[in-house]
């Protein structure tokens, strides 16, 4: 079977766009070929900083012939209908159509349209220019003399050449020379920009990849990542260190080089007085380098790992020297930020009003930054006021939550007023991702309680399903207050998530609240805090996602969750107890009996059958119905008492006693008795079954 090789070579593609672009190319090309009637065995995409490539193997040489029969009007139809049919079918006269007779419908015209298959080369020539012209780059550009013309080609960076070859695996291939904006596809590519700039003639993927590697280009991004990672580990180990691994940085760096060369640089040990998080971010963000640490250690070393795209004749000494100069300059800036943040602000006299408002100690650096944040009226959101106003709301909300979380009120208040103070530090101004973390470090430096310092970092957590949940009670309180304030505020101004759009990360905030409540066992009645049933429904959606991810069945969640259930921890405990019960033998049998009872009852209610208001013991004629009535009376009381005591397992055990009586009732008793009074009484007995099980869950929503 023939194979198709495609390469689009350009100036350097931003690393963050490469993987998705290669995937888009694969999907767009294969979808277009399949739509044109071709099939293929497999396809794989590749990318480097200067090229997107696609290898499609087992591609059919041509599309199949197509024969279509198109039914037309009756032969005695009006002339306009027949003319329209002929135009649509591409026929010039009715003589070119067939006449088919139908005993019921009469004679009518049928057009037989035969479409011969097309060669793959022709199809590729047709589809590729459109794919390239409409390629979904997040950002693109025009270039050259043609850039001012309407409809000029746009690409992420100037497109330089195209390779497109097609042919059998063991025979000579042919070039498919489609053209777009003056660039004609060929079998010529180029290797490394500096090491091998000469043209390379290729035939198919195997020699294409091999020739590129000879020309100092490793086509497979995963191989480049593997080389970088292993070489970085080895060079660190050889120096008595270990690599601080970073998957995101590894992905980015592998998209910056075609021929990775791993080197080690260093900086003065004096810079290690800077927090390791700042060092790591400085080196990562500005120079795309990895940091190292002593083997088995926690602190960083003064050695860093860099990845070059050039195999230098001096072994990389000049490259290391140049990178080292930049790293040292950046660390010097970081050290300056770190020291300035620990000092006094120059305009303290302008901050006294804000300091008084929040009870701040104007002699402490972090307090000064909070006062500055308030005094500058820094906007949180146009409709939700300033950061200072937000801190005041969080402070009030945290105070209300103190009794629920059991945290010290004074520590909560202190943590609340300092929670956003580090937003005015120079370190966070330079590296916003360090917010919270720097607050903790600066709080510790000025002697804050350990719980307060922890809360400044942890109140942002958890920031996703796998992030750590705060453990300290003060941190839990501030984290809840922060997230609840965000959700309440955006609900108040009707800025809710819609579809896939969630610009303010409200789903993440709600999931954070759910995780804190459940994983730290916090009993918080959400309606008393949010006072919004629609927001409570949003929490329910996040709770369902969380519980399903934990392995809970969706039907059991629905059976327990009522619209006004605002104690999410109790909902989770009910689901846990129901899951254990419903998977037991007693639970399965009771579920079957209960569903039979509720379905029969629902059918009679729908028909308008009379059902007694209550069960009359005088009308209980058979032993089975008497036994069931007695069992329900006892089980219902025991289950209700257990639920009131929040002992859901005991509630389930109480209901399990109904299994035998329910089974015997349906074996021995005819519900629809001829006597209307007895029938109404027995239906009332079924209603008692529904009400008894309803104390713990809506069994009608449980599948099985």
Swiss-Prot record:
One of its GO terms (biological process) is glycyl-tRNA aminoacylation. It catalyses: tRNA(Gly) + glycine + ATP = glycyl-tRNA(Gly) + AMP + diphosphate. It comes from the Bacteria. Its EC number is 6.1.1.14. InterPro entries: DALR_anticod-bd, Gly-tRNA-synth_bsu, Gly-tRNA-synth_heterodimer. Belongs to the class-II aminoacyl-tRNA synthetase family. Tetramer of two alpha and two beta subunits. HAMAP family: Gly_tRNA_synth_beta. This is Glycine--tRNA ligase beta subunit. It comes from Rhizobium johnstonii (strain DSM 114642 / LMG 32736 / 3841). The lineage of its organism: Bacteria, Pseudomonadati, Pseudomonadota, Alphaproteobacteria, Hyphomicrobiales. The gene is glyS.
